[in-house]
């Protein structure tokens, strides 16, 4: 796993225009992490983090700019668990095709970590492909209120800050309100990989991002819960941008606090 971190750190100091390497299947990190400049909207890249653990990376246009978005794929025996859609129907269809091409195992279950379109957009594509889709009751309720796609099944036991439940090869953790009131994080104990979703920002971020549904007061406290619950995490994957280590958590808290302070000053 130290090799994974080394590979990621080397990449973070390299040019973001570098071309990503093909996916490796040996369990080793698969070269440089794909960036927004390398992925046309409608295409998806896979990046192997560890044996049986991949991130999926897509891009989407929003307000005249193009943004990257991460998700997770975890092997569960002869099946795959998908964490988050690829931000839209076209991207999610491309994701399933890429998984079939590069991994060759069926996606049987999918979890959406909060109600925004970058996490649930494409749920209908998954459902049509026979994938059982899951989210917390809060996420399902908020998605319906927003007019977004709604995962079919409810994940129970994640209603209070600090709640954690095992779901196949991963642990789902509700740290409390942050980027949204319903955001979950996902931990892969076999690989010490923490997927922070949109509750966690990449190291290069200087903005709190989309805070329309955020709880700026609680976000740093929720990040602290993640830090305390997963001190052994070696790789941390944000919802958007480059993975890194546990320092992404403190960086996120600092960015959110700075945003809140600026808002108060204004």
From Swiss-Prot:
Alphabetized GO MF terms: hydrolase activity; metal ion binding
Record-listed E.C. numbers: 3.5.2.6
Highest taxon in the source lineage: Bacteria
One of the record's GO cellular component terms: periplasmic space
Enzyme class: hydrolase
Catalytic function, reaction form: a beta-lactam + H2O = a substituted beta-amino acid
InterPro entries: Metallo-B-lactamas, NDM-1-like, RibonucZ/Hydroxyglut_hydro, VIM-type_MBL
Subunit structure: Monomer.
Listed NCBIfam families: bla_class_B_core, bla_subclass_B1, blaVIM
Family to which this protein belongs: Belongs to the metallo-beta-lactamase superfamily. Class-B beta-lactamase family.
Additional free-text comment from the UniProt record: The class B beta-lactamase family has a specific amino-acid numbering system known as BBL, for standard numbering of class B beta-lactamases. A multiple sequence alignment was used to derive a consensus sequence and then the consensus was numbered taking into account insertions and deletions. This allows use of identical numbers, e.g. for active site residues, despite differences in protein length. UniProt always uses natural numbering of residues, hence there appear to be differences in numbering between this entry and some papers.
Protein name, entry field: Metallo-beta-lactamase VIM-1
Native source organism of the sequence: Pseudomonas aeruginosa (strain ATCC 15692 / DSM 22644 / CIP 104116 / JCM 14847 / LMG 12228 / 1C / PRS 101 / PAO1)
